[in-house]
Amino acid sequence: MWTPNVNIFRDPRWGRGQETYGEDPHLTSLMGQAVVRGLQGPESAKYRKLLACAKHYAIHSGPEWSRHVANINNVSPRDLWETYMPAFKDLVQKAKVREVMCAYQRWDDEPCCGSTKLLQQILRDEWGFKYMVVSDCGAIADFFTTHKSSSTPQHAAAKGVIAGTDVECGFGYAYAKLPEAVAKGLITEEEIDKHVVRLLEGRFELGEMDAHEECEWSKISPSILSCKEHRQLSLEMARQSIVLLKNEELLPLSKKQKIAVIGPNADNIPMMWGNYNGTPNSTVTILDGIRAKAGKKNVTYLKGCDLTEECVVNSFLTQCKADGKKGIRGTFWNNTTRSGKPVTTEYYVNPIAVTTSGQHTFANGVRMEDFSAMYETTFVPEKSCKAVIRMQYTGAFSLKVNGKTLAADSTWRDQPMRFELDVEKGKTYDVELAYHTVKTWGANMKLNIGEELPIDYNETIEKLKGIETVVFVGGISSQLEGEEMPVKIDGFKGGDRTHIELPKVQREFIRHLAEAGKKIVFVNCSGSAIALAPEAERCAAIVQVWYPGMEGGTAVADVLFGDYNPQGKLPVTFYKSSSQLPDFEDYSMKGRTYRYFSDPLYAFGYGLSYTTFKNENIKIEKQPAGDSSLFTLHSSLKNTGKREGTEVVQVYVRRCDDADGPLKTLKAFERVTLKPGETKKVEIKLDEEAFTLFDPDTNTMRVVPGKYEVFVGSSSRPEDLKKLNIILN
């Protein structure tokens, strides 16, 4: 299984940062190790449950749009060893990860999947990795197509294998040319053999060569999928991840009060999943969760606006006819060629939105894979105007109007498209959309014909008369940020973002709500940090919920209405604006993350609660020689509020005599749950790793003696920390 992604989320513009565990090396390492151990099973077992994969090795965190041509050549030794490498090293040496995926880009002029320094010298010789390396998909083909480090597929294949890449994933299939590479003398069969051995060893570890019943993991029943216990775990994960960023005594909400729920993510199922997601058999949206908690009669729902578009679509489907019926006719076949007798025919008078996600089908009797459809209608406009055909799809399509092909394409990513038509009143327009699935990709289709009209903010606000509190559910989604996407919208490029502000239409909507005197709870959904400076002024409460998963709607409602006390802490820095960010393509850590940046809107490690805590009597003791720890921190943490709550005690370290070093670096943390008025003793040990830093004098990572500052508190903000001074001999 190609997870976990332990790249460092160094820049919030990176679309795949949502897959990672944040911007901190220590946190990323701990989370990555836990994932590997959970996926592979105990080391003492005869067989592995599966083979986890540490990716993308190494120094890989965007931009998506340049990853096939990029040459990362400005990484200092300090950044390499203190920031980019620690998680990979720990997953190899501590968690015994069985696979490592090499990245697309070049590092110091060599493609990562062809770098002997990365794959042999560091990974195998220094760290002792003895398992398999897999290329990112298509990375070997990049050698001769984009990087131009190889002139032929044969040379690329030999280079990849000799450098240490055991498995080629994906497009181009250079390794299919290995027999030709052998014939040309570029590589020997003996050199190939050791890589084949590694692949076979992986299969042996999975029990593939033994009797099925001998492997304990083969006895896991499919019936556990989406079982009650797993859904409860999904709910608890979502609850614990929610971060309360601001609360002017508006939260928790009363279940008896009238509220409005507005925003593009309130009832957005795909947003809940994020990217590289499993497909749940059901999903609780945030609107679902709020309605279940407060009752439908107390909740007024208006979508208000889309994620990015500053318009709404007035649908013309009632001006369309097929077989004498209003709307669009959809005809379906259980093959991809639209041949033979159709399975069924359906008619749509509302915009089409169908998917195979969550075990759904496009229509009754239509299977989930290997099917096709034809959507047809005759559109007779009631007025002359600029109409639009809007669609969003996964699979392959061909769109025709009056027999003329407007577009034809296929994609495995959910791709939006828009086509303008200058239509005349009373004229006939025959619209035909042919669709079929491709390979085993999921299938999605949205289709509408209409007119784009500017958003009328005042009309929406008029509908909210008598409602004081508005829950605005906005942000972005994995349909805008993700891996190498064809998105071309202001603020987004190729899966990344070009600026980190909230999309303009949402910012304007919140401004109008605030000016109308509404008390706003802003629920922000995103896989990355959003610059929320204006929203922090206009909203009484801000809740960061990320992409919260199949039970996310229940989790969000639990927090909003006080059935769960938020305890999440930010794993990334929330900047005030895009102007605070360095060049996206610059991999230097200077000015990035809490370790080298000191003026955030919301700091790394920050997160509020419905109760309050006080950490007192903080002291640090040096441990005797021979102890596994160098120092032990002691403190007394008290819940000074009226609700049970959980605080995360965080410990940061800074070396005083290191002018170029980080401002502080997370080295330990402890999660503590307390009842109202309860006090607990907290003890946190700091071992050699807490003081293992890059030493510019020796150009190595080692325990560096000298003066240190140790910070203890509830976030990385200076005002949330207490400082202790120590000397390490």
What is the predicted role of each segment?
Residues M1-P696, T700-P718, I727:
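Glycoside hydrolase catalytic-domain context in secreted enzymes
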